[in-house]
Amino acid sequence: VFNLLQLAFTLAFTAGGIVYALVLLAITRDADRMLRMGGWMWSPVLFRGAGAKVIVEGRERVDWSKNYLFVSNHQSIIDICALFYALPVPLRFLLKEEMLKVPFVNWYARATGMLFLDRDSRRAGALVRRQAAALLREGKQLCLFPEGTRSRTGALLPFKAGLLQAAIDAGVQVVPVALDGCGKVLPVDGLFRVRPGIIRVRIGTPIAVTGPDAPDRQQLTEQAHKAVAAMLQPRI
């Protein structure tokens, strides 16, 4: 019963917050402000309601006056919430196209300039790469889940190389981010089983994509995967 109440609160609070954000956007025309609301209003309330504590490590490694392509592992549907909370920038995501069918969420995602990928289309990848590179050239912040799906076991899956090409095309650094604990607070198959716990968000050192030692797409993908994997290793 408690989990059902948590779910009802989460859905109601999210829907209400989105409506408020859309009204604010109509007044201010400031999509970045709407995105920042995810970090200072939506995420903290939802985590408190879930009994989850979020610990952020590594913010000092990043110059937040610049824009980046962030790449993160994917454990749970609350990963986006954790990233909004941890990264102090107006963050846009690449979402699967199925999210366009979710009421309220689709309105917010479109209004804030999120990108969408049709995973069943062979041509979609090239189009999204161009869109992502264009977004990064505009100075926006973008986050990808290069595993392509949520990990059911929590183990890090291989990264798909294609979309990291956007960082090379735009000349922006890639910041690896490791999420640890999201899958325990809200498991992949546990929509009604929210559990209290600790979520750690570890932010890695930016990876350069320009200069004499600049990596190609495959090398960049391997470096990002290795960095995330290292941050997921148990700490003594």
Question: Positions of the model-derived regions?
Answer:
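Catalytic core of membrane glycerolipid acyltransferases/transacylases, capturing the structured
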Residues: 17-40, 48-49, 63-122
